[in-house]
């Protein structure tokens, strides 16, 4: 094998194919008359359409339990529509109708906004405008927001905990914001659970914010309709990029925060079933000048935001360094840098690429030191192969670290490709601090995602472009179009990443520097924390793949 090529460079992306699809069988019975005769050569009658659920794809590999299958079945657009009708939202005249005794609130992640914008061939602002109108006018929602404030609060809390751990020298911390990685760790790597930060993701923090408002206003967040209660209920629907987020919403520690989780694919299917055209709600957006577009969008965002909340903040994200990660690792590095600069010392954040595209490390470097002193390290890591490698190195059960052959070509490539976030500092000192490639196991914090490339590659996103023939209503994509070949999927991902990086608004301040007045009232501390469930590891059980690559 060439010295420049090793198995560490192989990407673990596996495009969905026949090998990972549950075969479908349509059993048709012959229609036999009383005389014992039956006809041949006639067109068969249409039978019930066969569907494949997420549990079909995951349960076969042992990824989820039967109880988790039940949880997944409760998180679908069909379940939402049933609850929507049961709670009487279909009879409301408009958002805020006095006759509506219940309240529907909707949140959406920035990845989904970019995905829907690309799918319909419009910019993100136009997609936001149509999303707001659809959920206001069709579904009669009271509030529709991005999850930006919840994301900022989640990042803020993670950074605060990391700074506390830094003072106590507590070693590597792992994120728990990805349910796929969290479930995998709880079930198969119990010895790594103490390394997990128990700070909830943007989805659940946003849900906690909505829950606090509901309780203050006298609404019930229990939508189980016990005792026939169908009034003064708040229902929270969230739109996310990954299917494993459905399991996150079903965790006992998130009760009442999120009632239903769907993906953009399911939004498309839901609109198709209802005969609603998404394009119709773009209206005359394209004919308006930029100033008028922003004016109309701003008014609509303000109208659909809870009272006292900054609407612009909800539709923004914290700076993330690489352009499309969740920003936890980058914001921690920036906070350490700012604290170091405030103490009178020079410092800057530099990025160091890993051995594949799904690993990126941020190092806080003091360039004035001899040789360049590394003050702090944080890493963004995604994909199951990288997760396995990280777990092997961190697991204290005695796994030997596999020696990695470091050749001069790899070292020079790491230095050459490393990029600096700041322009100051001594080049030689910075170069010395960037020796080699990223090493997540030695970082203070690792932001982990099960999906290769993170949530921007979530399995629920719309990677294709909308067919031009969609005039009267939106047609759900056939399952055969999901994913496509690996090369085409990678091109679609790159286009989506570029749109996300260019069009999703980034807040000017870091989450830790935002004034309290700019953020919604912080929910109680316990509502922002997970409760971890540890399953004892069976040493005789092989380490099977329990995280799907395209959740």
Swiss-Prot record:
[4Fe-4S] cluster 1 binds at residues 20, 57, 60, 63. Keywords: 4Fe-4S, Iron, Iron-sulfur, Metal-binding. Residues 421-431 have a biased composition (Polar residues). The keyword Iron-sulfur applies. InterPro entries: Cytosolic_Fe-S_CAF (IPR050340), Fe_hydrogenase (IPR009016), Fe_hydrogenase_lsu_C (IPR004108). GO terms for cellular component: cytosol; membrane. The keyword Cytoplasm does not apply. Residues 395-435 are annotated as: Disordered. GO terms for biological process: iron-sulfur cluster assembly. One of its GO terms (molecular function) is 4 iron, 4 sulfur cluster binding. [4Fe-4S] cluster 2 binds at residues 178, 242, 451. Gene3D superfamilies: 3.40.50.1780, Fe-only Hydrogenase (Larger Subunit), Chain L, domain 3 (3.40.950.10). It holds the Pfam family Fe_hyd_lg_C. Belongs to the NARF family. Component of the cytosolic Fe/S protein assembly machinery. Required for maturation of extramitochondrial Fe/S proteins. May play a role in the transfer of pre-assembled Fe/S clusters to target apoproteins. This is Cytosolic Fe-S cluster assembly factor NAR1. It comes from Candida glabrata (strain ATCC 2001 / BCRC 20586 / JCM 3761 / NBRC 0622 / NRRL Y-65 / CBS 138) (Yeast).
């Amino acid at each position: 094998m060439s010295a420049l090529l090793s198995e560490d460079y192989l990407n673990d992306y596996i495009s969905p194919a026949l090998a990972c699809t549950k075969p479908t069988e349509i059993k048709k019975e012959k229609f036999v008359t009383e005389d014992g005769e039956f006809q041949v050569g006639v067109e068969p009658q249409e039978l019930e359409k066969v569907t494949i659920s997420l549990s079909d794809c995951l349960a076969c590999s042992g990824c989820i339990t039967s109880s988790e299958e039940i949880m997944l079945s409760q998180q679908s657009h069909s379940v939402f529509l049933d609850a929507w009708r049961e709670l009487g939202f279909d009879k409301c005249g408009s958002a805020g109708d006095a006759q509506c005794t219940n309240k529907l609130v909707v949140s959406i992640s920035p990845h989904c906004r970019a995905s829907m914008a690309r799918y319909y061939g419009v910019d993100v602002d136009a997609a936001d405008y149509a999303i707001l109108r659809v959920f206001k006018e069709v579904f009669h929602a009271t509030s529709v927001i991005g999850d930006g404030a919840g994301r900022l609060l989640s990042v803020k809390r993670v950074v605060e905990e990391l700074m506390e751990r830094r003072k106590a020298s507590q070693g590597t911390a792992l994120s728990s914001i990805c349910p796929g990685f969290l479930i995998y760790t709880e079930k198969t790597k119990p010895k790594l659970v103490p390394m997990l930060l128990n700070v909830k993701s943007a989805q659940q923090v946003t849900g906690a914010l909505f829950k606090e408002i509901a309780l203050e206003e006298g609404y019930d967040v229990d939508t189980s309709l016990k005792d026939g209660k169908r009034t003064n209920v708040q229902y929270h629907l969230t739109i996310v990029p990954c299917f494993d987020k459905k399991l996150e919403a079903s965790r006992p520690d998130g009760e009442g925060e999120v009632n239903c989780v769907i993906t953009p694919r399911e939004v498309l299917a839901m609109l198709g079933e209802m005969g609603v055209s998404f394009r119709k709600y773009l209206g005359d957006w394209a004919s308006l000048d930029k100033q008028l577009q922003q004016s109309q969008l701003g008014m609509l965002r303000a109208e659909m935001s809870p009272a006292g909340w900054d609407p612009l903040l909800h539709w923004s994200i914290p700076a993330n360094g690489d352009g499309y990660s969740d920003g936890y690792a980058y914001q921690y590095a920036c906070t350490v840098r700012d604290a170091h600069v405030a103490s009178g010392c020079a410092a800057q954040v530099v990025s160091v690429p890993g051995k594949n595209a799904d690993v990126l490390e941020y190092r806080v470097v003091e360039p004035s030191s001899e040789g360049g002193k590394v003050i702090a390290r944080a890493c963004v890591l995604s994909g199951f192969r990288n997760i396995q490698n990280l777990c092997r190195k961190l697991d204290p059960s005695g796994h030997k670290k596999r020696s990695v052959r470091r050749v001069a070509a790899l070292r020079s490539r790491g230095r050459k490709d490393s990029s600096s976030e700041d322009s100051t500092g001594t080049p030689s000192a910075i170069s010395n601090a960037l020796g080699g490639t990223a090493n997540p196991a030695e970082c203070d914090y690792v932001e982990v995602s099960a999906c290769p490339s993170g949530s921007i590659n979530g399995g629920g996103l719309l990677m294709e472009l909308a067919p031009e023939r969609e005039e009267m209503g939106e047609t759900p994509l056939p399952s055969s179009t999901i994913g496509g070949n690996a090369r085409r999927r990678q091109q679609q991902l790159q286009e989506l990443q570029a749109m996300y990086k260019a069009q999703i608004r980034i807040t000017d301040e870091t989450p830790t520097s935002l004034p309290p007045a700019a953020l919604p009232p912080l929910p109680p501390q316990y509502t922002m924390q997970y409760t971890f469930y540890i399953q004892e590891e069976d040493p005789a059980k092989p380490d099977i793949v329990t995280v799907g690559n395209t959740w």
